[in-house]
Amino acid sequence: MKFIFIGLIKFYRSAISPFTPSSCRFYPTCSEYGLEAIKRFGAFKGGILTIKRISKCHPFHPGGVDVVPDKVKNINNEKHLEKGVIRNED
């Protein structure tokens, strides 16, 4: 299952992303984050982390550095997921 999600992300990166403006507010990009999260935690947990990350990628969120966490204790714990975000305070 995780190879399907990885394939979808790679398809997006090669076939769709080149034709859209670069707009990710985070480092690493949402697709890089998704690949790492799914490779590290599998399709379910990595997929949930990726969906939560993509849902934060909008003009009203400041963005910043948001790396995949080392461990996922409780996937529903927003405080745990927000800990890795370093905001741009320009």
UniProtKB/Swiss-Prot annotation:
It is a peripheral membrane protein. InterPro entries: Membr_insert_effic_factor_YidD. Belongs to the UPF0161 family. This is Putative membrane protein insertion efficiency factor. Keywords: Cell membrane, Membrane. It holds the Pfam family YidD. It is found in: Cell membrane. It comes from the Bacteria. GO terms for cellular component: plasma membrane. Could be involved in insertion of integral membrane proteins into the membrane.
